[in-house]
Amino acid sequence: MSKLYYSFTVFFLLIVSCSTSDDKDILIAKGGRIYGGKASYYASEKSDHIFPMSVISMYDQRATAPIFETLLSYDEEAQKLVSNLIEAYSFSNDNAYLNLKIRQGVYFHADSCFTGQSRKLLASDVKFTLDFACSRHALNEQAQLLTPKIIGAQDFLNDTSVDFSEGVRGIEVLSDSSLRLRLIDSSQTILKILTHQSLAVISKKAFETYGNTIANHPVGTGPFTFNQKSAEGIIFERNPNYWRSDNYGNKLPFLDTLMIRFQKEGEDIFDSFTSQKTDLLSAIPINEINSLFGTLSDAKEGKNILHKVQHKKGVKVNFLEFDCNTAPFNDSNLRKAIYHAVDRQEICRDFLFGEGSPAEQGLLPSVPFFKYTRSIKNPYNLRLAKSYLRKSSYKEGDTIIFHVSTKEGSPEDKWCLNLVEKLRRTLRLNLRLERKSFNEKMNLIQSGLASMWMSGFISDYPDAESFLMPYYSKNKGGSSLKNSHFVSLEFDTIMDKARAVMEPIERNEYFNLCVDILNQKVPVVPLYFEDLVVVFNLRLRGARVNSFGVLDLSEAYLKPIK
């Protein structure tokens, strides 16, 4: 009898063992959510950077967001900061320093660099991240963010040795779970800056292992882990040890796989979406949605795909930008001539079909964190434009190349062509348009081979300072945002005052003065503010996009439409 019982017990345990091994990854979600599946979408531009401090565009940010997480995030609906990788923070009474408490139970992705060592997120990782963002390292494009804020950051940036053994003296590790930032100014805007996707936390151990090849080995704490990057795109896989859960208690994320696809020549992104090979469209003019998708009743009858549109009053500003350091645009009169020759209302009315808002007051949109305090007349004035042109040193016949990264035939491309024709006709500028990919255009700009180009900017954190810092000449480092080489001591002085003020109304007024100076000196010609439109296949639930253009798929799941 005992032998029979023993044999049965062993047999039962073997069955349970095999069953457990086969079913261990099967997860059942509450609240109608579903685990598993693969979601994908096409990127509007190919991303070359999967490292937070190297990103130079919204497309790069979207590629890093699944892997890397920020210390804080911004809740747009509540208009407040939300703890992320830190669970608490506090300022000293005099705002001289900021203490951060690291969230417990957060681990970096499994990677060979941690062999035999803990993957737990520590304060030393956060210090290393912030030190890196203040360094001269070739991978760092973000020195402008923290060097004006933290004591010792500028000195560290000036150190050509790029030695991380000590780092920034104003960033102090107090324990494994806490650190202190000693601050230059008292405005508390550093909290908003810490929501910046380019300050997402990286692993100190990963950098010690991979060094300058760290961008090929992205290791973060986010909902997805890096699988591979190829000519096809970037593949991410579910992080089984992710720390967050949703409101139902479901362990996130739901998706097994996420893919950001790179478009090949001849591929139709819209066809891929309508055939459900991809799950969202990240760039589509809102005026074309009805013509492309038809009506809701059509979709229910199977004539087209059921979809959901997220339309955000975006904070993206589109503008013309000049290299103010070299001819011909080191001549402010030529810049002013173009500033007054552009009809912003025409662009929005005739080419953007009423979508977007003319940027007639300046570079900043009117948003919760910035309000214009004065009215400005429509800057379009051909008589004034011609007056400035006569004062300029421009010689008729001199060729000016206008670099754009537009898709031929798109509304944006059409207004760019119209602008070239109009400036030729009204100001007799010998202007020529050249189309380049985004990365090609950026390479030309950063190498000094472009003098005028079409550009766009999305605020990376919810503060007016974000829009204005690229024109602050004390803003040190190799940031790609400083393309115009604009220098104004008057602008810098007012920015210094704005950065030191706590009172919101006074601070807002200083920022208005900064906008006035930009309108007068014209390093850029603000054109229009663009709304962000993302179209989701209705089977993809829980996906979100914010006004800063970052896609959040941490709570996204696939659910068949019945």
For every predicted segment, state its role.
Residues 224, 329-330, 357-392, 406-414:
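Structural transition elements
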Residues 76, 157, 162-178, 182-252, ...:
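Gly/Pro-rich hinge or "lid" segments in bacterial periplasmic/extracellular proteins
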Residues 42-93, 219:
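N-terminal lobe/hinge region of extracytoplasmic solute-binding protein
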Residues 45-62, 85, 112-115, 188-199, ...:
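A structural "hinge/loop" feature
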Residues 231, 390-459, 532:
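Ligand/substrate-recognition segments at binding pockets and active sites
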Residues 227-237, 259-325:
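Extracellular/periplasmic solute-recognition and catalytic clefts
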Residues 188, 337-371, 411-421, 443-562:
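Detector for C-terminal structural segments
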Residues 87-142, 180, 269-272, 328:
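Aromatic- and charge-enriched surface segment that lines or borders ligand/interaction sites
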